[in-house]
Amino acid sequence: MCGSSNANAIDSESLCRGSLTIAHVDENQDINYINLEGRKTRYPNIRRGYEILRETEILHVQLSGDCCWELYSRHHFGGHKRTILPGEEGMITLDFQPISLKRMECYEQYNSD
């Protein structure tokens, strides 16, 4: 169930394993990739850590592993939000340019109906 509203992402010292690959294109239409992995879970301004993103446009992202990712249109986790869940495969296009991101544990909420 990709994108299901029944999933909650819990911000923590992430125990999940995974990465987010960001494909970005420059003015010459050259596509390059940034792979976010490791211990870091919060990126309040991705353009500060990866200055190339100030001059390029993000085309799509690709998820690997069992983590949820939250992408925001403004720095410090503000603006529009898009949650990407494990199981969303392939190139995921966004309707905004993400500026801040969080990697999180994913937990399902189940109704007892």
What is each of the regions a protein language model found here?
Residues 1-113:
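Compact beta-sheet-dominated domain cores in extracellular/mature segments
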